[in-house]
Amino acid sequence: MSKSEQISHMTDVMAKFVGYTGKVLPDDVTAKLEDLHKKETSKLADVIFTTMIENQRLAKELDRPSCQDTGVIQFLVECGTNFPLIGELEALLREAVIKATVDSPLRHNSVETFDEYNTGKNVGKGTPTVFWEIIPNSDQCSIYTYMAGGGCSLPGKAMVLMPGAGYEGVTRFVLDVMTSYGLNACPPLLVGVGVATSVETAALLSKKALMRPIGSHNENERAASLEKMLEDGINKIGLGPQGMSGNTSVMGVNIENTARHPSTIGVAVNVGCWSHRKGHIVFDKDLNYTITSHSGVNF
């Protein structure tokens, strides 16, 4: 393919993939919702879970977005330095969002700040957001897609703790956020926690944590133990599906971390709602692609 044909091909695939993720949940989210439904003992929660699952069935059957809020589109990119379209990637992802907005369709969710007008295309200044990670000597491009809806974005919080607060302080911060804001974020939630030096590094890590598969664990045993502790603690709050009470509050807690300054503990929380619309696609140098988040999908 020529360069222009490559760009057109990848744009088309990404537009279709973005639209698809708004209609069909990833395999791990679907499986977790079904598992939580089976374990639920509250009659009201059972009805809500049944409605959630029926909603997803109809979204796929009718080829419509599963939630009216299709969010602001975000991409987390891990791109090799030898990938043929690395220089064109941001522009083509922008075009893919414009195309998906019409074809899927997606709700118009890009409002220019201060000027306060909706662009009508789901693109604007800095939108879609692209978070980059460059991989040396690789010719592949891994792209996580995410629909950041209003409800699941509202609980997002970050702060820097004094080191004396320790990991008890991290735990307290996460639980405070969940008890104060989790109710209205459409639970059961996937909770992403970032621990680093400052607010921006912790916040980005908490977003990356939401891309991890449900049921995965931090490679550090202490961090993995804290994931389980937080999951158990938040579940005991009993938010239940849609915040209407029940046995569970979350689908899981994922922690991502970096080394930190000895004088600070930066911590951030991001959450994904029950309709956690993430996707993961990997392109090789010939633009063949593999979708890992949704089985049996090809465009």
Question: What label would you give each PLM region?
Answer:
Residues 1-299:
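Non-transmembrane, aqueous-exposed alpha-helical and coiled segments at domain scale
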